[in-house]
Amino acid sequence: MEEPEEPADSGQSLVPVYIYSPEYVSMCDSLAKIPKRASMVHSLIEAYALHKQMRIVKPKVASMEEMATFHTDAYLQHLQKVSQEGDDDHPDSIEYGLGYDCPATEGIFDYAAAIGGATITAAQCLIDGMCKVAINWSGGWHHAKKDEASGFCYLNDAVLGILRLRRKFERILYVDLDLHHGDGVEDAFSFTSKVMTVSLHKFSPGFFPGTGDVSDVGLGKGRYYSVNVPIQDGIQDEKYYQICESVLKEVYQAFNPKAVVLQLGADTIAGDPMCSFNMTPVGIGKCLKYILQWQLATLILGGGGYNLANTARCWTYLTGVILGKTLSSEIPDHEFFTAYGPDYVLEITPSCRPDRNEPHRIQQILNYIKGNLKHVV
């Protein structure tokens, strides 16, 4: 998408919004599972001078009322309580999903409110017509349920962002390209036809969260408004893009969305400790370009991504895609430069693992989805 060559006043609204403040990044850096990841991502975007081509907007912190548009008061109050005390052994915590993969560490409520607020801020920028694309790379925590934490996610900022967008946009399409099924977002909207959720993810026995088979299609009025594309290990860019484009083409025609929320978790990328898909940022970038050409209000979120350098590579490359910029292969010198060794390049090379996706099974899945979308009115 080239930048508009229009007078500054009308063109300015087409410059993407980038949610950022030093305080926000340092808050996001504190999550134990991804230490300093937010700083690495922002520093690389800055090293390529991409921040200068976007409108930087400082995020607001979500209020209790804003968080309660989705989460229950009881859950939020408990999260606030254990966060103040740093109490990881509270007897009620298990019931709220706190513990093992979502430890109740000190300050976790402030972290959740910061992320939720940042995604709401991005959504509000789209509502206000400030931009067509708003980016919050530290958002995308798609597993949290209304009354429990799950899978490193304490607050479902994606749901909060969608609910905010619903104030203006009648039909919202949520697309989730993280390695894991976007179960929290799907569950939140499984009974409504106003939000369609589409998730491409790894689906195999014992793999978290264990949901998202092609037969999971939503419930009640929301039946056929949940689309799940189960994928096996080893998939690479070309096949992934073919699947993504094929599904999104049908979805767009059937649902006619007015706005898009796009979760771009980088745990699909080769080199991730999840060791499942075999993608590169180029493949995800093609999917992103396909969505951007609809020219709808689009909220961009991050998500998983546990190889920190590769996640920064991926989201910096995707920021370049949003801006229509080709980035130099050589990583510019910056604070985290040494993390990009031994080659110090932006590109990521797929590994030589086999692709476990059989063409006939993929075709079956695509046919099944196409059949379901005939019911969408």
UniProtKB/Swiss-Prot annotation:
Residues engaged in binding a divalent metal cation: 178, 180, 267
Result of altering residue 306 to F: Loss of catalytic activity. Complete loss of catalytic activity
Cellular compartments per GO CC: cytoplasm; histone deacetylase complex; nuclear chromosome; nucleoplasm; nucleus
Post-translational modification: Phosphorylated by PKA on serine 39. Phosphorylation reduces deacetylase activity observed preferentially on histones H3 and H4.
Catalytic reaction(s) noted: N(6)-acetyl-L-lysyl-[histone] + H2O = L-lysyl-[histone] + acetate; N(6)-acetyl-L-lysyl-[protein] + H2O = L-lysyl-[protein] + acetate; N(6)-(2E)-butenoyl-L-lysyl-[protein] + H2O = (2E)-2-butenoate + L-lysyl-[protein]
Family to which the UniProt record says this protein belongs: Belongs to the histone deacetylase family. HD type 1 subfamily.
Protein name, entry field: Histone deacetylase 8
Organism: Homo sapiens
